[in-house]
Amino acid sequence: MGQKINPIGLRLGINRTWDSRWYANTGEYGKLLHEDVKIREFLTEELKQAAISKIVIERPHKKCRVTIHSARPGIIIGKKGADIEKLRKKLSEMTNADTSLNIVEVRKPEVDATLIAQLIAQQLERRVAFRRAMKRAVQSAMRLGAEGIRINCSGRLGGAEIARMEWYREGRVPLHTLRADIDYGTAEAKTAYGICGVKVWVFKGEILEHDPMASERRAVEGDNQGSSSNRRRENA
């Protein structure tokens, strides 16, 4: 079962939490869910170059709080914060609520499954050899602290007549282990021969405490430790 199911969905409530964090009455639930889908589609389309990892939506009383996890926050913020203010106004119009917009920098995009998948998809669109793209991504992830990674590419790879699936794995990726902190991401490459799908699983170690926010907290702590060690090296 662990081989088939989305590994993030399998671990919700154990060491992962939802990207939409709000409660609603039965009558409002459908409307708010559609709003979330529209917000994510709008931001993904508007910020194609910003390397967005995920979008978290929270709804405190009559408000909306959107948090964008991005590897290139400067593109979203713009000169003197002009672009982020435009985005905030558009989101307020879409939700008819007072909307706040937060940006969280992803300091290690090389071990973020969604960003790895996007990078490989971009390389496939530029006609880079798929094996080379996969191998590069695997080496970068393992070098920066991932305990295991698996990448699947499927479709008419290299312009082949018959579609197929190729995969590459290094280290451990224990999909059945619920305490395993596994990040999962997908992307599509629109090539001249058709669409190629990319799936990425990244194993970041085990989380022993039963806490749905553990994975997110761990990522932030890891980023802070990485930035402080970089500062120490610079001072030395």
Curated annotation (Swiss-Prot):
TM region positions: none
One GO term of the biological process aspect: translation
InterPro entries named in the record: KH_dom, KH_dom-like_a/b, KH_dom_type_2, KH_sf_prok-type, Ribosomal_S3_C_sf, Ribosomal_uS3_bac-typ, Ribosomal_uS3_C, Ribosomal_uS3_CS
GO cellular component, one term: cytosolic small ribosomal subunit
SUPFAM superfamilies per the UniProt record, alphabetical: Prokaryotic type KH domain (KH-domain type II), Ribosomal protein S3 C-terminal domain
Quaternary structure and interacting proteins, as annotated: Part of the 30S ribosomal subunit. Forms a tight complex with proteins S10 and S14.
Family matches, as PANTHER family: 30S/40S RIBOSOMAL PROTEIN S3 (PTHR11760), SMALL RIBOSOMAL SUBUNIT PROTEIN US3C (PTHR11760:SF19)
The protein's name: Small ribosomal subunit protein uS3
Biological source species: Brucella canis (strain ATCC 23365 / NCTC 10854 / RM-666)
